[in-house]
Amino acid sequence: MEKEAYILEVVKYLKGRGFQDIKANVEGYETPVGYSLKTDEQKYIPDVTARQFAENSYFEVVLKTEPVSRTISKLRLLSTLAAAKSGKLFLMAPRGHFNFAKDMIAQHQIHAEVIKIA
């Protein structure tokens, strides 16, 4: 399944749990604000952002088929942003990618919660 299809699953998951102001990096939704690091020319756009109970949270679909170094940089940035904005970072891991996501955040000390998605 393509990453865009997983992002739509995440949006559906969030709507079912009462999240509001959902922005997603897929067609048909408002695109979340992109961020960049001072040391990097790359612009990182979260897959999904949403708000619940005045907390802004970031949701990132993690696939082991994506470049690891870019994924780690993006997750570190989003983790820092979430902490600064009193929010959380959630890694949405499809079947077969869950252990990869758990190992990655443990190895690179990224503060995030990993959630399984279908």
Positions of the model-derived regions?
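Domain-level recognition of nuclease-like catalytic cores that cleave nucleotide substrates
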Residues: 92-118
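A short, highly charged nucleic-acid-interacting micro-segment common to nuclease
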Residues: 1-12, 90
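Conserved catalytic cores of phosphodiester-cleaving nucleases, focusing on short active-site segments
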Residues: 46-74, 78
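Active-site metal-binding core of divalent-cation-utilizing nuclease and nuclease-like domains
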Residues: 1-4, 16, 21-55
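Structural motif
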Residues: 25-28, 61-65, 92-95
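Hydrophobic beta-strand segments of well-ordered beta-sheets in folded domains
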Residues: 55-58, 86-91
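Arginine/glycine-rich "motif VI" loop of SF2 helicases in the C-terminal RecA-like domain
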Residues: 79-86
